[in-house]
Curated annotation (Swiss-Prot):
Gene that this sequence comes from: vapC
Lineage: Bacteria, Pseudomonadati, Pseudomonadota, Gammaproteobacteria, Enterobacterales
Protein name: tRNA(fMet)-specific endonuclease VapC
NCBIfam families for this protein: PRK13725.1
Subunit and interaction comment: Forms a hetero-octamer (4 VapB and 4 VapC) complex with antitoxin VapB. The complex binds 2 different sites in the vapBC promoter, probably via VapB dimerization.
Entry keyword Nuclease: yes
Organism of this sequence: Shigella flexneri
Length: 132
């Protein structure tokens, strides 16, 4: 049963094995984690613009083979629209991709795992954990 949705930075920490505590938590929670297709897009973008795109894309492919990737769907879009409006009213916006990942996690009732808790904690009804 899925419990956690990993943010992009936690995926990168896991891939690089730094800090080691993130990899340990990743290994302990096999079968309970997923990423959003939005996170996959961010990982691919980072690899494509890197100095070694082929190598980095292969690493991402290996990582993604060990975790569920959830498609961004209508429920996620609905939650994202609500989050964007709530944060705009408060004058406390977050980045568009973080809004989408937050909306996706909230729509599925998942805990977002991130080291960027300051951004995600602004989102009502979203639970966060920092494994770093």
């Amino acid at each position: 049963m899925l419990k956690f949705m990993l943010d992009t930075n936690i995926c990168i920490f896991t891939i690089k094995n730094k800090p080691a505590s993130v990899r340990e938590r990743f290994n302990l929670n096999q079968g309970k984690m997923c990423i959003s297709s939005v996170t996959l897009m961010e990982l691919i973008y980072g690899a494509e613009k890197s100095q070694m795109p082929e190598r980095n894309l292969a690493v991402i492919e290996g990582f993604v083979s060990r975790i569920d990737v959830l498609d961004y769907d209508a429920a996620a879009a609905t939650h994202t629209g609500q989050i964007r409006a709530e944060l705009a009213r408060q004058g406390r916006p977050v980045g568009p991709f973080d809004q989408m990942i937050a909306g996706h996690a909230r729509s599925r009732g998942l805990i977002i795992v991130t080291n960027n808790t300051r951004e995600f904690e602004r989102v009502g009804g979203l639970r966060t954990e920092d494994w770093s």
